[in-house]
Amino acid sequence: MITIKKGLDLPIAGTPAQVIHNGNTVNEVATLGEEYVGMRPSMKVREGDVVKKGQVLFEDKKNPGVVFTAPASGTVVTINRGEKRVLQSVVIKVEGDEQITFTRYEAAQLASLSAEQVKQNLIESGLWTAFRTRPFSKVPALDAIPSSIFVNAMDTNPLAADPEVVLKEYETDFKDGLTVLTRLFNGQKPVYLCKDADSNIPLSPAIEGITIKSFSGVHPAGLVGTHIHFVDPVGATKQVWHLNYQDVIAIGKLFTTGELFTDRIISLAGPQVKNPRLVRTRLGANLSQLTANELNAGENRVISGSVLSGATAAGPVDYLGRYALQVSVLAEGREKELFGWIMPGSDKFSITRTVLGHFGKKLFNFTTAVHGGERAMVPIGAYERVMPLDIIPTLLLRDLAAGDTDSAQNLGCLELDEEDLALCTYVCPGKNNYGPMLRAALEKIEKEG
């Protein structure tokens, strides 16, 4: 077991009840283009086209053969594009239940599948896009070979769903999906299942080729970047792949039913949610519809993902992300507080222990307010308190801010994704957002070396 001591469990109100309910019915779903790093789409559909579930919507020009499929049957009502015609979303109005069928196998056959059989089914169904690489967090090329594959079956993000609750509903499908993953490279590459040390994820009998790694401690103990760092670190010439446990369930169902499984069980939670809980919805769900009559009055920000690293869901991207397993809702913090800096702050939380709210175990109604403007970095040890990886965070963040990619690479930036620096952003006295800085550095390194 690996114990994480440095980090932070954010004391945020609105913790979800770990019981699954049916969410609001949604009649719109979307595939979001900006989730896929470096992807350039070659569109296979137009507005007004009727599509089946599992039908190809677009293909990646930079990664030929990697296709992105429809999460539901219906009509393509809108293809949203942003600046420089960057694809934002392909929106489908859900109608009917027609779907493309794929090759199915008996459960007893899964352990003897060839790598080609596994790969073909994953690519054709669009489930190849469930994989992401480290470094760079991109959908892997079809001819790429990783050092290992990581399955993340734990989640320490604020307000997250407990994977154990979800996996109890899909125990057989999860095991089938893990078996399929072991066959992707004919059993030649290790598959690591990372779980909470206290969770009781059923894996009996043991699956050949699956190595279980247990983690405990504070966030970011549940991030895949933490798992990779301690188990099989990456570098400029070494790549690993990872995916989440609900995509493993989808893979298991694909191979045993021949159908694309797009159900999602997510956490709908946060200070502005009336009844925080786990809800059953579908991949790409319209979040305005999903959260209708679920939120407290006022101006709210709906986030696809964690409050620390998720994306604002509004306008053309008002949909559940491909990799999101939670929807978080905060009040927009537009109110100004007179002399807030001098008040004792019994209703505020700070990692520096400079306010009264630090004392006693209480939950806080966090808002989107950052309480100050962007300014210079202040190295007071805050980054080191929340960074459990074997890197020097202050120096790395300085190099990212300065655009020094050579030094940043030497300090370990290739191991990281935006979510790995989310706590550094949260505790930064200078109110700097280090996620975009990291992404800019990774893009430059990939392009120029």
From Swiss-Prot:
Coiled coil: none annotated. The keyword Transport applies. It comes from the Bacteria. It is an enzyme of class 7 (translocase). Keywords: Ion transport, NAD, Sodium, Sodium transport, Translocase, Transport, Ubiquinone. GO terms for biological process: sodium ion transport. Its EC number is 7.2.1.1. GO terms for molecular function: oxidoreductase activity, acting on NAD(P)H, quinone or similar compound as acceptor. It holds the Pfam family NQRA_N. It catalyses: a ubiquinone + n Na(+)(in) + NADH + H(+) = a ubiquinol + n Na(+)(out) + NAD(+). Composed of six subunits; NqrA, NqrB, NqrC, NqrD, NqrE and NqrF. Belongs to the NqrA family. NQR complex catalyzes the reduction of ubiquinone-1 to ubiquinol by two successive reactions, coupled with the transport of Na(+) ions from the cytoplasm to the periplasm. NqrA to NqrE are probably involved in the second step, the conversion of ubisemiquinone to ubiquinol. This is Na(+)-translocating NADH-quinone reductase subunit A. It comes from Actinobacillus pleuropneumoniae serotype 3 (strain JL03). The gene is nqrA.
